[in-house]
UniProtKB/Swiss-Prot annotation:
This is Ubiquitin-related modifier 1. GO terms for cellular component: cytosol. It comes from Laccaria bicolor (strain S238N-H82 / ATCC MYA-4686) (Bicoloured deceiver). Transmembrane segments: none annotated. Pfam families: Urm1.
Length: 122
């Protein structure tokens, strides 16, 4: 868990072949800011007088962060229209994200997010 209130620690797990897009690594431990730009911009910016609007970090921001910082190839197999592609199951602390508000779920320090592809070639 993070000791800094400006950041949060998350455990990310990939399965069902989705890990192949993320350096073939199933488990990641990441730290993200607790407060993020309202436009989901994940690039590091310096604070200035005209700082952008911010909001608490949610799963939508996390998906953009994963795409911009951990995804190694084939973005189109991970995200579509600002969210995960159909066929990717998202669990938040072992609960289907549809029951948690999907992308609007506000992340908490120590959350575990699991993403599993349910689509397989044949």
């Amino acid at each position: 868990m993070s000791t800094d209130s400006n950041t949060m620690f998350l455990k990310i797990e990939f399965g069902g072949g989705l890990e192949l897009l993320f350096s073939n690594q199933r488990s990641h431990r990441i730290t993200i800011p607790s407060t993020v730009p309202a436009d989901n911009n994940t690039s590091v910016t310096t604070k200035d007088a005209a700082s952008p609007a911010t909001r608490p970090a949610d799963v939508t921001y996390l998906l953009h962060h994963l795409r911009d910082h951990l995804l190694k190839e084939r973005e189109e197999l991970f995200m579509e229209n600002g969210t995960v592609r159909p066929g990717i199951l998202v669990l938040i602390n072992d609960t289907d994200w549809e029951l948690e508000g999907e992308g609007e779920y506000l992340l908490k320090d120590g959350d575990e997010i699991v993403l599993i592809s349910t689509l397989h070639g044949g």
